[in-house]
Amino acid sequence: MSGLTHFDASGHAHMVDVGGKQETQRIAIARGTIRMLPATFALIRDGKAKKGDVLGVARIAAIQGAKRTADLIPLCHPLALTRVAVDFELDDALPGVHCVVQVETFGRTGVEMEALTAVQVGLLTVYDMCKAVDRGMVITDVSVREKRGGKSGDWKAEDTAG
């Protein structure tokens, strides 16, 4: 692994110059989970949450999160995203919800941060919409699962658990 790219020779933070990089298709997939009480899970599953369609609102929030990443993470480049796909998987065994986001662009830098931000914002929205009945929900295991494109090539998480 190379050194930290967001610091110059003097140790000052800077936005990485991607001007000389090749434009390629960039894809990143991130995943995260929110664990909750069985009663909270049932409200989401059955569509009975007082604030409405929890996963529908969380899907829109995740998409917005991906689009606004450069506004939130200081050294991220603003990107023209070509696709943001959000999937929620209900898991009775936890109980909880998994959020999987795939982000794509055609550009000079990757979209891992956009995918991670989207997952976090989606799961935070689930928390926000359900906190009145379950303040003990836990957001966990947020990670990049796969990235494709760019100079460093393709990468996939070694574990297959998520």
UniProtKB/Swiss-Prot annotation:
Residues in coiled coil: none
Amino-acid biosynthesis is among the record's keywords: no
Record-stated family: Belongs to the MoaC family.
Residues at the active site: 128
Gene designation: moaC
Pfam families (alphabetical): MoaC
Entry's EC annotation: 4.6.1.17
Protein's UniProt name: Cyclic pyranopterin monophosphate synthase
Pathway where this protein functions: Cofactor biosynthesis; molybdopterin biosynthesis
Known function: Catalyzes the conversion of (8S)-3',8-cyclo-7,8-dihydroguanosine 5'-triphosphate to cyclic pyranopterin monophosphate (cPMP).
